[in-house]
Amino acid sequence: MVMNTDSLALIKNSIKTIPNYPKEGILFRDVTSLLEDPQAYKLTIGLLVEHYKDQGFTKVVGTEARGFLFGAPLALELGIGFVPVRKPGKLPRETISESYELEYGHDVLEIHVDAINAEDKVLVIDDLLATGGTIEATVKLIRQLGGSVNDAAFVISLPDLGGEQRLEKMDLKLVSLCEFEGE
């Protein structure tokens, strides 16, 4: 994706790095600082809209919880529906679920069974790509419901953690606005 380097620098510079959070040795990339900057937030959504408009998407799927913060406004600007993928027990209608591995243990995600169908071309979005486990589980849910998903967008990517390679094995085209080294 070709984008204005000044715009990308503004977005990247709006993301604060918090050392030793949530544990010693981790550099936490705090996307909430981007949300506090209306210029950076608007620019982030605008760049994603510009990249994904006119590609025939029918739904944007965002992962809990920060994926909602970028997915919902993106879907609104694209004029398509937004579908949340959530942790168990948070969605009121019938759901399907997918378990996935974390660094220490596992987690589960759910989606409404009637949220996606075989006619849907889906764009998946989350705030950050690290190991790729959350998006891998999300893509599996969408495909179980018959939806077509070949694209995933992120505000931040941490390439050292291997998520890009993991998701490319699922035939996903990935777009990240900012990359940061390390964990």
Curated annotation (Swiss-Prot):
SUPFAM superfamilies: PRTase-like
Entry EC number(s): 2.4.2.7
Subcellular location: Cytoplasm
GO annotation, biological process: adenine salvage; AMP salvage; purine ribonucleoside salvage
Annotated Gene Ontology cellular component terms: cytoplasm
Alphabetical list of InterPro entries matching this protein: Ade_phspho_trans, PRibTrfase_dom, PRTase-like, UPRTase/APRTase
Pathway(s) the chain acts in: Purine metabolism; AMP biosynthesis via salvage pathway; AMP from adenine: step 1/1
Protein keywords: Cytoplasm, Glycosyltransferase, Purine salvage, Transferase
Primary site of residence: cytoplasm
Enzyme type, top EC level: transferase
MF (Gene Ontology): adenine binding; adenine phosphoribosyltransferase activity; AMP binding
Reaction equations catalysed: AMP + diphosphate = 5-phospho-alpha-D-ribose 1-diphosphate + adenine
NCBIfam families membership: apt (TIGR01090), PRK02304.1-1 (NF002632), PRK02304.1-3 (NF002634), PRK02304.1-5 (NF002636)
Family: Belongs to the purine/pyrimidine phosphoribosyltransferase family.
Self-association and partners: Homodimer.
Role this protein plays: Catalyzes a salvage reaction resulting in the formation of AMP, that is energically less costly than de novo synthesis.
Protein's recorded name: Adenine phosphoribosyltransferase
Organism: Shewanella halifaxensis (strain HAW-EB4)
Gene that encodes it: apt
